[in-house]
């Protein structure tokens, strides 16, 4: 089959630039998007729904439908082409299949974003329960694949999204930039690997193609803040501005200067659509990033400006005042060298435990009547990932492979993050920014 987009002109959609266009011969397709109310699933649905001739029907599968405030981000025409299917992928495949059949679900293409985050033991890290994560998330995919068989749904392509933990970024120093052909990191259970094995076995048995997409920190607007790591940064900025204080930085100098990657959920959705529609991309894994490296020394001043803080503060330079997370003498993904030590002066989780800040947020909620979300109601769930994003390790995803196959999409991460914060204000998660975005140019 000829390339779906290679000979076609590029397009711009808002802040998202150099996006592919596709032949008009691609039309009347159907898609199943799982994890439809999550940050990646919802934005991939938004991408598909932008093309009514190409995608006549999108089935959104999740335990609960996206709430009305999220659906309000769609046009009436888009909402008419999406239908929710209430599915619990931890139930038996037969039960899942019966609900698919009852709805008459069809899927030329499947985009799998379902994810479960079992709560770790008190005091443990977000990914400390590695085996439980592996068991739970592998079961999600395995049950769904079994249900597709029972319901006689055989897609042309099945896309699974994993992430940068594929490269062991959470376990210590790894070879950078992260490249799709890098070998698995087997220092502890990683649910991405058994998920991949399930997918490959299913696709081999059914003679269909697969794709795996690996994003970094994901940017987008959904009302589930648990995995939206940059949401608590805006909460912090809004509260500091409300109190008339500056936006202090909690990490050390290395975290301040380290250049890291982000992955806007919309751009990753465009890349995912491109990957499944391109025949040459079948059976390939692709990294997904904005191609806009962004260190905290450039993010923090903009974050302070967007919310009207009284300036910003840099990292603590007196190392005697820093806390150190020292993993001890443990092996690293790199296979040699010292383990990674993380240094910080304070955490967002500690900051959120100050009653003054919770009180300030209540006052902000009173001021902005559309603001309904209170992240201080469950501090551990809402702020833990924010600490990782604020002063965690920097890393880089190689986009060489996607470019080699013809991908050209780009977004400025500052513009994308500002857009996400603006949309989060529309769905009751944040107050709106008070200043416009400036691209990093």
Question: What feature does the model see in each segment?
Answer:
Residues 271-386, 398, 404, 421-428, ...:
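Mid/C-terminal beta-alpha module of Rossmann-like enzyme folds, strongest
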Residues 108-191, 211:
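Conserved Rossmann-fold NAD(P)-dependent oxidoreductase catalytic core, especially the SDR/UDP-sugar
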Residues 31, 67-70, 74-139, 143:
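NAD(P)H-binding glycine-rich loop region in Rossmannoid oxidoreductase-like domains
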Residues 161-162, 197-227:
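Conserved beta-loop-beta element that borders a ligand/cofactor-binding pocket
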Residues 184-188, 216-230, 252-265, 292:
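Glycine-rich "substrate-gating" loop/helix at the edge of Rossmann-like oxidoreductase active sites
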Residues 206, 220-236, 275-286:
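Glycine/proline-rich active-site loop of Rossmann-fold NAD(P)-dependent oxidoreductases
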């Amino acid at each position: 089959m000829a390339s779906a987009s290679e000979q076609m002109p590029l397009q711009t959609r808002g802040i998202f630039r150099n996006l592919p266009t596709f032949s008009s011969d691609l039309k009347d397709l159907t898609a199943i998007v799982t994890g439809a109310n999550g940050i990646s699933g919802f934005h991939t649905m938004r991408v598909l729904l932008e093309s009514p001739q190409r995608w006549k029907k999108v089935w959104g599968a999740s335990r609960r439908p996206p709430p009305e405030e999220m659906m309000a981000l769609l046009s009436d025409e888009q909402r008419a082409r999406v239908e929710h299917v209430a599915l619990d992928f931890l139930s038996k495949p037969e039960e899942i299949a019966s609900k698919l059949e009852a709805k008459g679900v069809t899927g030329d293409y499947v985009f799998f974003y379902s994810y479960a985050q079992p709560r770790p033991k008190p005091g443990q890290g977000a990914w400390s329960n590695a085996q439980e994560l592996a068991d739970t998330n592998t079961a999600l995919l395995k049950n769904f694949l079994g249900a597709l068989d029972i319901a006689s749904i055989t897609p042309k392509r099945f896309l699974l999204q994993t992430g940068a933990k594929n490269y062991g970024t959470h376990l210590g120093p790894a070879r950078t930039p992260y490249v799709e052909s890098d070998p698995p990191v087997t220092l502890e259970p990683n649910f991405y690997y058994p998920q991949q094995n399930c997918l490959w076995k299913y696709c081999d048995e059914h003679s269909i193609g697969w794709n795996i997409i690996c994003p970094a920190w994901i940017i987008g607007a959904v009302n589930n803040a648990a995995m939206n790591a940059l949401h608590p940064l805006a909460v912090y900025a809004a509260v500091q501005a409300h109190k008339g204080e500056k936006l202090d930085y909690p990490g050390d100098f290395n975290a301040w200067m380290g250049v890291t990657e982000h992955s806007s959920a919309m751009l990753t959705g465009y890349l995912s659509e491109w990957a499944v529609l391109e025949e040459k991309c079948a059976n390939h894994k692709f990294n997904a990033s904005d191609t806009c490296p962004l260190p905290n020394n450039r993010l923090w001043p903009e974050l302070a400006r967007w919310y009207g803080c009284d300036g910003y503060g840099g990292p603590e330079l007196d190392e005697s005042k820093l806390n150190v997370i020292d993993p001890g003498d443990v092996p690293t993904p790199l296979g040699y060298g010292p383990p990674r030590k993380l240094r910080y002066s304070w955490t967002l989780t500690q900051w959120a435990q100050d009653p003054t800040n919770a009180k300030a947020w209540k006052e902000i909620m009173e001021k902005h009547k559309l603001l309904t979300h209170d992240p201080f109601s469950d501090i551990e769930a809402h702020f833990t990932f924010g600490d990782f994003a604020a002063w965690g390790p920097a890393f880089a995803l190689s986009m060489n492979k996607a470019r080699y196959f013809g991908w050209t999409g780009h977004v400025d991460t500052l513009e994308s993050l500002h857009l996400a914060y603006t949309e989060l204000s529309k769905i009751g998660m944040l107050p709106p920014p008070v200043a416009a975005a400036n691209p990093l140019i």
